[in-house]
Amino acid sequence: MNEVNEKLLGDIKNNIDRTWNDDAADKKLSGIILRGCNRINDICGCEFDYEQENTAKELLISYVMYALAGALDDWQKNYSQDINRLQLIQEVKAYADREAGKQGIV
């Protein structure tokens, strides 16, 4: 992910109760969102669609809140169960895809 779209930015702003428009704050928030997306993608080994309401988006929202509070060191520790769950789900999906490919199933 290279750029935050307006929908995702709006969703995150709504979730963190930032209802006002401020270009400088939006730019900073967009950077935090991008870093969060990249970190979650790296941890799980795949790219998620953060516009969908899913566990990855929940983790992203929590990442943003922790980043804004200056507490990113605590984020991975406090959300380790959710992160591990998301990793396992992705590993199971990847395994199923590999097995389906071996059997010629699409």
Language model regions located:
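Mid-chain, well-packed structural core segment of small domains
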Residues: D49-E53, L59-L72
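Conserved short "hinge" loops at termini or chain/domain junctions
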Residues: M1-A56, V92-V106
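Protruding loop/beta-arch "assembly-hinge" segments enriched in small, turn-prone residues
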Residues: G70-V106
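Generic detector of low-complexity/intrinsically disordered segments
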Residues: G10-D11, I61, L88
